[in-house]
Amino acid sequence: MAIIVNNVGAGERLMYRVLLVDDEQIERMALAKKIDRYYGDKVNIYQAVNGREAVAMCSTHNNDIIIMDISMPEMNGVMAAKYIRRIDDKCSIIFLSAYDDFEYARNAIKVKALDYLLKPCDINDLLAVMDMAIQKLDKENAVKENTATDGKGNI
């Protein structure tokens, strides 16, 4: 993990782990580039080509945000999310899908997805949802930090 010296406020983290899951390499790479351009050194971006690979990656590393396609070979996004939730119930899952059928959105809600965006997705919509996920993480980290100390940084 890279060490970055930065002026970071209490409860704010330097790096967030983002997992992109899509069987379409061109879409995955384009999305990674756009996210990297927006967040820069605040994110580490990892990639998986299908749901099965995403589950395997989640079993070895915690991810802060998972951006996942619904329709993929080997294991679809909803099924992968069910397995991922058994491993990590706190990560934010954002689905990107070409399916506008309500049933897909309902299934996304069942696995506690943060959002369900339709492809082609406006990058500003995705970044807004990612910002919400990061704010949620920062609040959770601040609570953990204050719980571990007396609120003034003392243990």
Language model features: what each stretch is:
Residues 16, 43, 91:
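Switch/coupling loops of ABC transporter nucleotide-binding domains
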Residues 1-17:
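Non-catalytic signal-transmission and effector/linker regions of two-component phosphorelay proteins
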Residues 48-52:
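Conserved Asp/Asn-Gly motif in the active-site loop of CheY-like receiver
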Residues 25-46:
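Two-component/phosphorelay signaling modules centered on CheY-like receiver
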Residues 55-147:
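CheY-like receiver
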Residues 16-27, 31-32, 66:
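Conserved acidic segment of CheY-like receiver
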Residues 149-155:
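C-terminal output/effector regions of signal-responsive regulators
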